[in-house]
Amino acid sequence: MKLLIVFGLLTSVYCIHKECSIQECCENQPYQIEDPCPIHYYSDWFIKIGSRKSARLVQLCEGDYGKRIPIHYQMFGNYTISCEPLEINCQAPPVGSLIVRCSYDYDFVEHHDVRVVLDFV
């Protein structure tokens, strides 16, 4: 129990200093993630592998908006169920952290990233 409290506090402190979204879901159940990007912004979902700012981003969906489909990677199993809106199997990302990239432009020239933290119920 103490470990959960400490983890919750560390996550909250991390989210205060960086843009972050905390969402609750039932573990190992399908979950439609709430998009933290502002209205009228495009969003693209990634798994960030590594903790550095320059860490590699692995894209979860591909295709044009309105016709996006999940990319299934062997190392992630069936993590991504659908893309519009994003639906995943509620579990911690197999590696790294879940990131959504928000941009007002379709080409994502200017963007900001939001880390999505899942709290399991």
Curated annotation (Swiss-Prot):
Residues 1-15 form the signal peptide. The keyword Phosphoprotein does not apply. The keyword Signal applies. Disulfide bonds join C25-C90, C37-C102, C61-C83. It comes from the Viruses. Keywords: Disulfide bond, Signal. Residues 19-121 form the SARS ORF8 Ig-like domain. It holds the Pfam family bCoV_NS8. PROSITE patterns: SARS_ORF8_IG. This protein corresponds nearly to the fused 8a and 8b proteins of SARS-CoV. This is Non-structural protein 8. It comes from Bat coronavirus Rp3/2004 (BtCoV/Rp3/2004).
